[in-house]
Swiss-Prot record:
Major role in the synthesis of nucleoside triphosphates other than ATP. The ATP gamma phosphate is transferred to the NDP beta phosphate via a ping-pong mechanism, using a phosphorylated active-site intermediate. ATP binds at K9, F57, R85, T91, R102, N112. InterPro entries: NDK-like_dom, NDK-like_dom_sf, Nucleoside_diP_kinase, Nucleoside_diP_kinase_AS. SMART domains: NDK (SM00562). One of its GO terms (molecular function) is ATP binding. GO terms for cellular component: cytoplasm. The lineage of its organism: Bacteria, Pseudomonadati, Thermodesulfobacteriota, Desulfobacteria, Desulfobacterales. The gene is ndk. Its EC number is 2.7.4.6. This is Nucleoside diphosphate kinase.
């Protein structure tokens, strides 16, 4: 079984999309094995997105991600990373496939409702960033 991190971003929380995201995860057969709502500080957002520190969007991304509450979840399932990334859709919602979360709900590239890990190593780092082993209800 593979694990991945999901974040419902501040725009998704503000717009009341948590339930819709969870519904789609469960419909896809991805098991939620940890979940909590947090409000990241700017420093936490900068640490989480440190890999993008030199990118031109780093400042706006970390400001946005610390602008309101988010819901972080650990998902588990066969090929969980690929399945969740497919469910999310392309980062740029205009390029996302019909029926994906981002195509259906995003309003701009940064306010694209959800985040998901892109690889097993990334998932391990991201899950550990928000959860300790006692908070994860896996097998």
């Amino acid at each position: 079984m593979e694990r991945t991190l999901s974040i419902v971003k501040p725009d998704g929380v503000e717009r009341g999309l948590i339930g819709e995201v969870v519904r789609r995860l469960e419909k896809e057969g991805l098991k939620i094995i940890a979940m909590k709502m947090i409000h990241m500080t700017r420093a936490q957002a900068e640490g989480f997105y440190a890999v993008h520190r030199e990118r031109p969007f780093f400042e706006s991304l970390t400001t946005f991600m610390s602008s309101g509450p988010v819901v972080v979840m650990v998902l588990e399932g066969e090929d969980a990373i690929l399945r969740y990334r497919t469910l999310m859709g392309a980062t740029n919602y205009k390029d996302a496939a019909e029926g994906t979360i981002r195509r259906d709900f995003a309003t701009e590239i940064e306010r694209n409702v959800v985040h998901g890990s892109d690889a097993p190593d990334t998932a391990a780092f991201e899950i550990g960033y928000f959860f300790n082993s006692f908070e994860i209800m896996g097998r």
